[in-house]
Amino acid sequence: MISAVYAQSEAEGILNRHRRIFSAFKNYVILSSTGGTAEPSPPSAAKREFMEHRNWNKNNIRTSLLGYGCMRFPTKADGTIDEARAEALLNTAKAAGVNYFDTAYPYHNGQSEPFVGRVIAKWDRSSFYLATKMPLWNCKSLDDAKRIFEEQLQRLGVDYIDFYLLHSLHKARYEKAKAMGLVDWLWQ
């Protein structure tokens, strides 16, 4: 019974911390993908203290608890990314202390990575962590995977990717990735 009470108390504490972070974040960012304008302004220094970060034990990495997913940016009527609004959202998130940005090869019909690359080119590369994903369904061989990886570096305009994930991974795809040598190549 005591451990159940402790676990509930611990869970409530975690939820309250996340509510505080989100509350501080939502006060100055408008997250809208349809209609209206999104003109978020950077937070004051006082608001930045609300973003919590965690250190990764075995690496010199410190990521924000809140990451920014780049799958659903605001779009224009023709379906393309509304770059002014989306850039304002990314800049606001970064100013609020978010330092983990996640995109992928197929997001926004292949336009998320190039757009994110144009935005992050204006930032100090050491101020954020970038994640993207290998589209395993496009890989028939290790050479395909290497070509796609190099293409992603170019699309993002970076020399390295901090977190490289395998997209839509399930057991069969993982086994295929292992068989083609992709898993071993990624661990090098």
For each of these PLM feature ranges, what is it?
Residues 4-7, 19, 24, 29:
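Short hydrophobic alpha-helical segments enriched in small aliphatic residues
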Residues 13, 35-36:
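Residue-identity detector for glycine
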Residues 28-30, 37, 41, 47:
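Short, positively charged and aromatic/hydrophobic N-terminal segments
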Residues 2-14:
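Extreme N-terminal basic, low-complexity initiation segments
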Residues 71-73, 104-106, 133-137, 166-169:
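Active-site beta-loop-alpha junctions enriched in small/polar residues
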Residues 33, 45-128:
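N-terminal binding-site loop/beta-alpha segment at the start of enzyme catalytic domains
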Residues 77, 139-188:
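Glycine/proline-rich, positively charged
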